[in-house]
Amino acid sequence: ITCGQVTGSLAPXIPFLRTG
């Protein structure tokens, strides 16, 4: 699991909706 730019979460790294 890679944490790029998350959308729907204010904390990176957290894989909610990854766009990167």
UniProtKB/Swiss-Prot annotation:
- Any idea which UniProt keywords this protein has? Allergen, Lipid-binding, Transport
The family line of this record is: Belongs to the plant LTP family.
UniProt source species: Citrus limon (Lemon)
Q: What does this protein do?
A: Plant non-specific lipid-transfer proteins transfer phospholipids as well as galactolipids across membranes. May play a role in wax or cutin deposition in the cell walls of expanding epidermal cells and certain secretory tissues.
Its recorded name reads Non-specific lipid-transfer protein
Give the Gene Ontology MF terms in alphabetical order.
Answer: lipid binding
